[in-house]
Amino acid sequence: MAEKAPPGLNRKTSRSTLSLPPEPVDIIKSKTCSRRVKINVGGLNHEVLWRTLDRLPRTRLGKLRDCNTHESLLEVCDDYNLGDNEYFFDRHPGAFTSILNFYRTGKLHMMEEMCALSFGQELDYWGIDEIYLESCCQARYHQKKEQMNEELRREAETMREREGEEFDNTCCPEKRKKLWDLLEKPNSSVAAKILAIVSILFIVLSTIALSLNTLPELQETDEFGQPSDNPKLAHVEAVCIAWFTMEYLLRFLSSPNKWKFFKGPLNVIDLLAILPYYVTIFLTESNKSVLQFQNVRRVVQIFRIMRILRILKLARHSTGLQSLGFTLRRSYNELGLLILFLAMGIMIFSSLVFFAEKDEDATKFTSIPASFWWATITMTTVGYGDIYPKTLLGKIVGGLCCIAGVLVIALPIPIIVNNFSEFYKEQKRQEKAIKRREALERAKRNGSIVSMNLKDAFARSMELIDVAVEKAGETANTKDSADDNHLSPSRWKWARKALSESSSNKSYENKYQEVSQKDSHEQLNNTSSSSPQHLSAQKLEMLYNEITKTQPHSHQAPDCQEQPERPSAYEEEIEMEEVVCPQEQLAVAQTEVIVDMKSTSSIDSFTSCATDFTETERSPLPPPSASHLHMKFPTDFPGTEEHQRARGPPFLTLTREKGPAAREGALEYSPIDITVNLDAGSSQCGLHGPLQSDSATDSPKSSLKGSNPLKSRSLKVNFKENRGSAPQTPPSTARPLPVTTADFSLSTPQHISTILLEESPAQGDRLLLDAELPAQCQGLAKGLSPRFPKQKLFAFSSRERRSFTEIDTGEDEDFLELQGARADKQADSSPNCFAEKPSDARHPLSEEGCGGSSSPPNTGHNCRQDSFHAVGEVQKDSSQEGYKMENHLFAPEIHSNPGDTGYCPTRETSM
């Protein structure tokens, strides 16, 4: 039974958290298995039929069904969960109600509380044209949208004007920009506000001084008898003019565009405010004579009157005054219409009143131009009373003139007022928008507001998914050198099970590349820089070499095998192909049942075995050269385990000979598939597969597909054996695996899938990496029949090979006790045992010999069956010339569906 996920973590999580992108076949299967689909928009779930979405195939939801790859799905939606058939869109959930209703009913309505611009953006996102809006909502939608677009256009123009102030092409750009902001943008800083207040005070002071200079009590008489300005007030005015001049020059020097500065209306007002003063000084100082002064005096008076224009400088600091000026400029059509109406009325009524009043004595309507004044003040409803008609006909004309004046003025005036109010509000909105934009820019620069795309967030989460936090104060000699914060899926015991269930076969090679070395003082931390997702082939090769070059450690006593952490395991999957050879009778040991055993890594073996191999991998490839692999058995067989430790070789001899002469014990081997599984647990060693040699092999084929040792590799070892006839293996009742079905026919080779697991011991239970050859593993060579004179045992590397059965750490002690109780049955339990049938002597290959002295004798797990006996049993018939042998390894309660997560799938080895 597989380990279950922690209760805090939901197994039905998003695709992006526990598995790699699924294959197209899984996506298509998920869509075809259900007629309905779940649409999650902003956290609000909607359920709709697929055929409803097919009504609008060119929209975003219509394209959802045609997306069969991971990339195309992420282009349409933001996330998805194939297990729940759910697709997530990070959009406004309220607007989606109207959009989904459009799919169902064909009627598109806009909600009353929805912003028109936001609803338009939602329509653009979902791929629906706004022309489908119903007539009841169309007018309101377009009116609001046009209004919002106009406001946004004006705001964009203002921002473009402000952002168009380029200072890069001039000298001292930074200083000039600061000075420009200081003088032109009062809201940019506190200093700018203070400077604006000082400027306003100078404007008010200059206006007051100009008014006081006209008082007779404060005036003085010059040498020509003409009144002149008070000297004290003249000094005040000079200071104000000096301030205005300095301000104007600084603006001009710091302006990014000089010509645009001259054309600005406010700058023209500033120039007119200071220019009359200098013209007056120039005229008075250059013309000292009386005659010249009399000629210049009137010109000087004109320029003195122009000083009053200084009051208009307040418009620079007043939004209302600016709005008035812009309103007059924008309302020139209405103002022209008003003037035209007044001119027509004045002409008509002044003519009528002239002909009505010209015959009266002492009349003031002496001519039509003289009557214009009366018509003007009458139509404007002012009525000074200095001129008025006296006759009856003149009074009637005057009454009609008043009514016409009210009607003529009343028509264009509201338009002008409306323009003023709208422009005033727009100015206020633009000021707030500018402040908001500037605040957002400052916040983004400070990092308080971060905008991130969903795909970028997913990529960053994948990069940061493996994190190791170093414990403070721990040394390298401590038991745990790094504290894993359990963010990495490789650290979860159930994570690989979820991976193998939720992804396709093609992605298996990338799932089991996680390395954790705990038998040395160094630990490979899964950091973001060296996470399995980013390890290159060279780095993986280096890691594997470091693992294989680790120095051997001393054995520990069996009672000291307390495993707080389960050691890392290396799972090697070897597919061996047997060639037909002479028929021999083999003795198979009795099967034993092991119950109450949890195996979390069996799913790894199953998914590795269940991978669909290509035709190239199914058949052995011809070698590039005659390279023969010889696996030699030792001739001496020690009797005891201690004697074996003293005399046995640390590992088996693996030689490679060239030429066709090496035909004895030749093994034909094909692509290796070694899966390095990062998991910890107690292990047992079993040697699987028939160790039969062939003395008459012609030309063994050998091909080796070199790949990264940490990546998934498959080894096909073809034993060539001349057999006259052999019965086929009976079909298994369990679901067979694609690569483990065996065929003992005469013409077809036998594929044997054997799982060898290499485990690294825990920190406190160091096992020999360069293990001695087990005693009972060597017993086979000594007790072989003369029919097997040249059989040789083989080993694949310098490290121990163990049959893979991962046991939960919580049940290690019980399992060891169970194995200790069965120590006396070692001679009767073997995974793949060979003996001579006529002598009735069994030479078992027990697991104790391969497992070393650190654990009690263990049963051959590759031959075991559980209490259900669901798989076909081993059949042995002494009366037959040949016999059938079946080797099965499976777990109880097999679930064939990937969604069933309670138990691990079956692992089967048939021979």
UniProtKB/Swiss-Prot annotation:
One of its GO terms (molecular function) is protein heterodimerization activity. Phosphorylated. Phosphorylation at Ser-608 of the FFAT motif activates interaction with MOSPD2, VAPA and VAPB. A motif (Selectivity filter) lies at residues 381-386. Residues 1-21, 503-534, 685-740, 821-911 are annotated as: Disordered. One of its GO terms (biological process) is action potential. The keyword Heme does not apply. GO terms for cellular component: dendrite; neuronal cell body membrane; perikaryon; plasma membrane; voltage-gated potassium channel complex. InterPro entries: BTB/POZ_dom, Ion_trans_dom, K_chnl_volt-dep_Kv, K_chnl_volt-dep_Kv2, K_chnl_volt-dep_Kv2.2, SKP1/BTB/POZ_sf, T1-type_BTB, VG_K_chnl. Pfam families: BTB_2 (PF02214), Ion_trans (PF00520), Kv2channel (PF03521). Residues 1-190, 255-265, 318-332, 425-911 are cytoplasmic. The chain crosses the membrane at residues 191-212, 233-254, 266-284, 297-317, 333-354, 396-424. It comes from the Eukaryota. It is found in: Cell membrane; Perikaryon; Cell projection, Dendrite. Keywords: Cell membrane, Cell projection, Glycoprotein, Ion channel, Ion transport, Membrane, Phosphoprotein, Potassium, Potassium channel, Potassium transport, Transmembrane, Transmembrane helix, Transport, Voltage-gated channel. Residues 508-522, 837-846, 874-887 have a biased composition (Basic and acidic residues). Residues 523-534, 692-711 have a biased composition (Polar residues). Voltage-gated potassium channel that mediates transmembrane potassium transport in excitable membranes, primarily in the brain and smooth muscle cells. Channels open or close in response to the voltage difference across the membrane, letting potassium ions pass in accordance with their electrochemical gradient. Homotetrameric channels mediate a delayed-rectifier voltage-dependent outward potassium current that display rapid activation and slow inactivation in response to membrane depolarization. The transmembrane segment S4 functions as a voltage-sensor and is characterized by a series of positively charged amino acids at every third position. Channel opening and closing is effected by a conformation change that affects the position and orientation of the voltage-sensor paddle formed by S3 and S4 within the membrane. A transmembrane electric field that is positive inside would push the positively charged S4 segment outwards, thereby opening the pore, while a field that is negative inside would pull the S4 segment inwards and close the pore. Belongs to the potassium channel family. B (Shab) (TC 1.A.1.2) subfamily. Kv2.2/KCNB2 sub-subfamily. This is Potassium voltage-gated channel subfamily B member 2. The gene is KCNB2.
